Each structure stands twice: as C-alpha cells, then as structure tokens.
Design a protein with these regions (language model features):
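Positively charged n-region of N-terminal signal peptides that target proteins for export
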Residues: 1-4
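Bacterial N-terminal signal peptides
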Residues: 7-17
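An amphipathic, aromatic/His-enriched active-site/gating alpha helix that lines ligand/cofactor pockets
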Residues: 8, 29-34, 60-75, 91-124, ...
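Sec/Tat signal peptide C-region and signal peptidase I cleavage site
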Residues: 19-22
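Glycine-rich beta-strand-turn "strand-cap" elements at beta-sheet edges
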Residues: 24-36, 75-85, 109-144, 148-152, ...
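Short hydrophobic/aromatic beta-strand micro-patches
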Residues: 43-45, 89-91, 150, 197-199
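Short, surface-exposed ligand-recognition loops at beta-strand->loop->(often short) alpha-helix junctions
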Residues: 45-56, 150-161
Length: 239
C-alpha cells in the first residue's frame, strides 16, 4: 500500500507541475534568425492499401525538392516496423527559401497526399539546436533513428534539458558507426519540443550505442524532465 501511495503522490505532483506550465513556462524565445537554416521534419501515415501510391508521390517529391533553390537536404525515410509510415527531413538555407517551398511544392504535395493518408500530415518546423553542417546521408543500408522529445515546459524541468541534450549529441557522434547525430528545436510556441535525428551504418551499431552506459544514463536523467513517451522510431531510406 505504501508503494502505491508513493506512486500516486508522484503522479499527482507531476500532473500539478504540468497544469501550471502555462503560468511558469520558460521565457519566450527570440524570433528565429531569418537567415539561419530551417530544419523541417514531417511525419506521414499512409493508408495501408494506398502505400504504393504514397511512395511514388514521395519519391517524385524528393527528386524535385532537392533541385529547389535554397534546399540543403531532402531525405525521405520509411519506418522499419510500420511500413506505411514515412518521414521527410528537409533543410533550407533560410526562411525565405523555406517559405517559397512551402507555398509551392510543399502545398502541392500535401494536396496530392491528402486522400492517401490515414491521419493528418504532421509538419514540425525547427531551428538547429545541436547540429553540424548539412551533409549527404552516408551510403549503404543505414538506419535512421528519429526521436521526438517533449520536455515539460516548466523551468525546473526545461532548464535541465539543454545540457543533457548537448552532451548526448557530442558523445554520440564519436561512437562507431554514427553518420549523423543532430538535435533540432521547434520554433515559436513549441520550443520545449526537440527532435533527435541519428544515422547509423546498421542496426547493430545503433544497438551498441543504445547499450552504452552513458546512453542509458542520458535517458535515465532525461526521463523525469519529459511529459510524454521517449518516442524513438527506426527508419530506412525510401527506395
């Protein structure tokens, strides 16, 4: 009974902290630098019966997107478990380039995809939080790990997250098999939301990284600061 009471008290304290988030939210972040790169991650959930049509559209979009002015990266990946789910990762040199894309080819893609989807197109716009210069994905049968991290927007939680995230990025890039490890921060009213993107030469290398003591410690230290599941999903390049 005592353990149940302790668990209930802990849950109530966390709920109370989250309820007061609007009153204690971190100070508003400055407007993004219009000349800084814009990082976009979009999640796509196709109807299973329409997966092939979705894949065709996404491949066409990837080819065209890479040729647009200001595009620095356009990658499309397919989830390894639920293969009707996809993610698009784009980097644009500045806000002007992104807005031009969003108003043209980006809007056209959404219109074409809409009848094929099982849930709405989910686009997340970010700034770079812990990133390296945009580069092409390494060759081979690589594995992408994309993780959404939702930090509780209360200073006692939010202020502790950046040092943990920065250290995890710096350490992870040194691990065998890592081709990219970057952390993005959403803009405007969702600055407590982060996206962690990793590329590994194969799944075995990813699993070795996940089993390291410091990786486990990072997740243990981060867990009390987040308000949702540590949502890691594995993908392969759409081919």
């Amino acid at each position: 009974m005592k353990s149940v009471a302790v668990m209930l008290a802990s849950a109530l304290m966390t709920a109370a902290a989250m309820q007061s988030a609007s009153a204690q939210a971190p100070a508003a972040q400055p407007a993004p630098n219009p000349n800084a790169p814009v990082y976009v991650v979009s999640y796509i959930d196709a109807q299973n019966a329409l997966k092939s049509q979705t894949m065709t559209l996404l491949k066409q979009f990837r080819t065209a997107c890479a040729k647009e002015d200001g595009n620095q990266r356009c990658e499309i990946v397919q989830r390894m478990e639920q293969q009707n789910e996809f993610a698009i990762m784009e980097v644009w040199k500045d806000q002007a380039a992104f807005k031009a894309h969003a108003a043209g080819p980006g809007a056209q893609l959404r219109d074409k995809l809409k009848p094929l989807l099982g849930s709405p197109y989910d686009e997340r716009i970010h700034t770079g939080f812990a990133v390296t210069a945009p580069q092409a994905a390494p060759s081979g049968r690589i594995v992408y790990a994309i993780t959404h991290i939702d930090v509780i927007p209360v200073p006692q939680f939010f202020d502790k997250a950046p040092p943990l995230l920065n250290a995890a990025a710096a350490d992870g890039r040194k691990d065998a098999g890592n081709g990219r490890l970057e952390i993005l921060q959403q803009i405007e009213r969702r600055t407590n939301h982060f996206t962690l993107i990793e590329i590994w030469s194969n799944k075995r290398q990813l699993e070795a990284h996940q089993s390291l003591a410091r990786t486990i410690q990072f997740r243990e230290q981060l867990q009390p600061l987040i308000g949702a599941l540590y949502d890691e999903r594995l993908y392969k390049i759409l081919d």
